[in-house]
Amino acid sequence: MQVRSIIFVCLLSIAGFFPAFANEQKIIKDLKEGGKLILIRHSEAPGTGDPANFNLNDCKTQRNLSAEGIEQAKRLGDFFIKNNISFEKVYSSEYCRCKDTARYAFKNFETFSGLNSTFADPSKTPAHIKRTKEFIEKLDKSKNYIFVAHHTTIEGLASTFANSGEMVIVDRSYKVIGTFKVN
């Protein structure tokens, strides 16, 4: 009886692996085609929101990446290198946790304030999303672009929630092609 239980658990583990593997392979294939927008929520940063007195120019006043968040960002960059996935440019929110995610994952990036969080003032979300879409519209449609942002921005663009360190891949009409989180 114990042997059967062990075999059953092993089979369940294997069965759980294949859908995740198939999703990863589909994501890689889609990204290699180009023309995708890769929306990445910043890596793990403990807490919610930012203190009332935070300053964009002072990381000590903001939520920052945890040690796991730093490792998560590095794994994200490794995923692109390992799978030979090209992208034209990385854009990041001006918040330190996003800039650090972009830096640890991809080294080079530019900040774009349209990607900044609107968590503290949701009334700003529509204006941020409009500005970001106008910015994206000017980019080469045949290339992949990476945007490291916050859940408010990703939800506003793709109408889907992203966990910390998760990628939401969309086409140029903001239709979600897939989501993926590097382990």
Where are these regions (language model features)?
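Bacterial N-terminal signal peptides
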Residues: 9-16
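...with weaker cross-activation on analogous glycine-rich loops/strands in unrelated enzymes
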Residues: 135-137
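Short beta-strand segments
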Residues: 41, 147-149
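Sec/Tat signal peptide C-region and signal peptidase I cleavage site
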Residues: 17-22
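Short beta-strand-plus-loop segments that form exposed binding edges in beta-rich domains
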Residues: 152
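Hydrophobic beta-strand anchors of alpha/beta hydrolase catalytic cores
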Residues: 37, 145-146
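Active-site-proximal alpha-helix that buttresses catalytic centers in soluble enzyme cores
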Residues: 23-122, 130, 140, 155, ...
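Positively charged n-region of N-terminal signal peptides that target proteins for export
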Residues: 1-6
